[in-house]
Amino acid sequence: MKTINESDYKKELGILIDVRDPLSFKEKHNPLSVNVYYDKLLLNHNTLLDKNKKYFLICDKGHKSKQAVRILEFYGYDVTYVINA
């Protein structure tokens, strides 16, 4: 599993996805991120994601984003787990 610190993430690297629920995302989030809730992302990855793009996943505690990275890697996506988010 590839990892990166949130402070090292730059928009040019790829798309930053916050997998928290919309309410938690609205309360506080990285301004460079887009919100795609964990369940929605995993159920609809084939229509939401492009295997030719790079994705960086974050959440508040790291559990869901880490789990999502493992699953999406299995499906062949270029995903990186963002730590210290």
Where are the regions that the model predicts?
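Flexible, polar/low-complexity N-terminal or interdomain linker segments that lie immediately upstream
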Residues: 1-30, 38
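Catalytic cysteine-centered active loop of the rhodanese-like fold, especially the PTP/DSP P-loop
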Residues: 46-85
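Glycine-rich nucleotide phosphate-binding loop and flanking beta-alpha elements
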Residues: 23-25, 42, 63-65
